[in-house]
């Protein structure tokens, strides 16, 4: 048997270890796979990313899992990643995608102390837009099965949970405004604020999304295509809102600042309206911002999930328990209502990104990869 992994500096050649590197029913893991690779830095996902069909399947190291992906998540920030905005020194090519849910099909010796072949896991790690991804065991989270709902909790759910817990100061009776409230992370911000007994206002773009927001407890959905957000906030909430969960940027950010109550808090988790521009930014009225904040003793604070990774696992555990107990709706959008049908296969990731930026999705956009005939899950 060929060398499969290293345990420290020792090559593992024990034949009894071979079972960790075999798929179910004894069929070998294929030598080649498909994956999405960023080959050019650009916020235009279609221009930046290439589907490569003949890539070697990687082997896991001593502390790693090899995961056959079943569901992968699409995030607004995928185009920031493809543009190289998170690391100005990054060089192409590099693998795309942040998160996945799949099945462990191989693992290193150290990783086998906590995981086994055939186990379902969720993970947040680079390179998820692939048929197989090597995932460090330390970041993998066991889940009860291969369900897309578990994927919604990774980036989207934990962003809402940690940011509101650490920065929101939620308490009974507070008024909370959630922008893009029917999206992947907005849906969780709405529900978590309601769990804290807050009054929740949510912006969205359609009657269907308004209905969804009502179904998860939103007190006042605002369809900005039929109502002016600023007018509604001034007329119905003259004292302002206490907390804003903001992901849109631009004019929506300006409206949210104007709507803050005395000692209000605005949490910026993104500014998606600017991501497709060359700079990645959306214009805001920054010149008047200090005066507005001073006048109300208000604050604006950013939240980037990577800066809160020590809180990630605890947040996932809490959200998984909520979902298992029927306390949390995890809305999944697999493109069933899109013109070309469901998002199935890696080639559909391109359509899924377009779909998101056309503001079509309700809930988290998830791409399904074909199941293996050998899977037990």
UniProtKB/Swiss-Prot annotation:
Gene Ontology process terms (BP): lipid metabolic process; negative regulation of fat cell differentiation
Reaction catalysis annotation: 13,14-dihydro-15-oxo-prostaglandin E2 + NADP(+) = 15-oxoprostaglandin E2 + NADPH + H(+); 13,14-dihydro-15-oxo-prostaglandin E1 + NADP(+) = 15-oxoprostaglandin E1 + NADPH + H(+); 13,14-dihydro-15-oxo-PGF2alpha + NADP(+) = 15-oxoprostaglandin F2alpha + NADPH + H(+); 13,14-dihydro-15-oxo-prostaglandin F1alpha + NADP(+) = 15-oxoprostaglandin F1alpha + NADPH + H(+)
Pfam family, one: ADH_zinc_N
Function: Functions as 15-oxo-prostaglandin 13-reductase and acts on 15-keto-PGE1, 15-keto-PGE2, 15-keto-PGE1-alpha and 15-keto-PGE2-alpha with highest efficiency towards 15-keto-PGE2-alpha. Overexpression represses transcriptional activity of PPARG and inhibits adipocyte differentiation.
Name of the featured protein: Prostaglandin reductase-3
InterPro entries, per the entry: ADH-like_C, ADH-like_N, GroES-like_sf, NAD(P)-bd_dom_sf, PKS_ER, Quin_OxRdtase/zeta-crystal_CS, Zn-ADH-like_protein
Record lineage: Eukaryota, Metazoa, Chordata, Craniata, Vertebrata
Family, similarity comment: Belongs to the zinc-containing alcohol dehydrogenase family. Quinone oxidoreductase subfamily.
SUPFAM superfamilies the UniProt entry points to: GroES-like, NAD(P)-binding Rossmann-fold domains
Protein location: Peroxisome
Originating organism: Bos taurus (Bovine)
Protein residues bound to NADP(+): 185, 205, 209, 224, 247, 269, 275, 303-305, 361
GO cellular component annotations of the record: peroxisome
E.C. numbers: 1.3.1.48
N6-acetyllysine: modified positions: 35
UniProt keyword Acetylation, yes or no: yes
Keywords: Acetylation, Lipid metabolism, NADP, Oxidoreductase, Peroxisome, Phosphoprotein
Modified residues (Phosphoserine): 299
UniProt keyword annotation of Kinase present: no
First-tier enzyme category under EC: oxidoreductase
Gene Ontology molecular function, alphabetical: 15-oxoprostaglandin 13-oxidase [NAD(P)+] activity; zinc ion binding
CDD domains: Mgc45594_like
Cysteines paired by S-S bonds: none
């Amino acid at each position: 048997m060929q060398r499969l992994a290293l345990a420290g500096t020792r090559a593992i050649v024990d034949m009894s270890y071979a079972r960790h590197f075999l798929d179910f029913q004894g069929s070998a893991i294929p030598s080649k796979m498909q994956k999405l690779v960023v080959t050019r830095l650009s916020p235009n996902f279609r221009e930046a990313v290439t589907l490569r069909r003949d890539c070697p399947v990687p082997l896991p190291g001593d502390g790693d899992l090899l995961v056959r992906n079943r569901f992968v998540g699409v995030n607004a920030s995928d185009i920031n990643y493809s543009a190289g905005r998170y690391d100005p020194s990054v060089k192409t090519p590099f693998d795309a995608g942040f998160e996945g849910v799949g099945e462990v099909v191989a693992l290193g010796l150290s990783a086998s102390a906590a995981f086994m072949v055939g186990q379902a896991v969720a993970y947040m790690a680079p390179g998820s837009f692939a048929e197989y991804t090597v995932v460090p065991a330390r970041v993998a989270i066991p889940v009860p099965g291969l369900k897309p709902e578990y994927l919604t909790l990774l980036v989207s759910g934990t962003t809402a949970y940690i940011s509101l817990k650490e920065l929101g100061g939620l308490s009974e009776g507070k008024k909370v405004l959630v922008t893009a409230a029917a999206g992947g992370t907005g849906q969780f911000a709405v529900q978590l604020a309601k769990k804290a007994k807050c009054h929740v206002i949510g912006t969205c773009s359609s009657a269907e999304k308004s209905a969804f927001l009502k179904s998860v407890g939103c007190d006042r959905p605002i369809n900005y295509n039929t109502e002016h957000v600023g007018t509604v906030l001034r007329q119905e909430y003259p004292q302002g809102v206490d907390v804003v969960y903001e992901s849109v940027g631009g004019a929506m950010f300006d409206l949210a600042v104007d709507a803050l109550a005395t000692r209000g808090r605005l949490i910026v988790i993104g500014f998606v309206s600017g991501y497709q521009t060359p700079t990645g930014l959306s214009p805001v009225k920054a010149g008047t911002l200090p005066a507005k904040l001073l006048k109300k003793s208000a604050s604006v604070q950013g939240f980037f999930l990577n800066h809160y990774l020590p809180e990630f696992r605890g947040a996932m555990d809490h959200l998984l328990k909520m979902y298992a107990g029927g306390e949390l709706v995890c809305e999944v959008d697999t493109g069933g209502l899109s013109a070309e049908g469901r998002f199935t296969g890696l080639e559909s990731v391109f359509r899924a990104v377009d779909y998101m930026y056309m503001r079509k999705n309700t809930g988290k956009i998830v791409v399904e990869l074909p199941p293996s005939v050998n899977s037990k899950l």
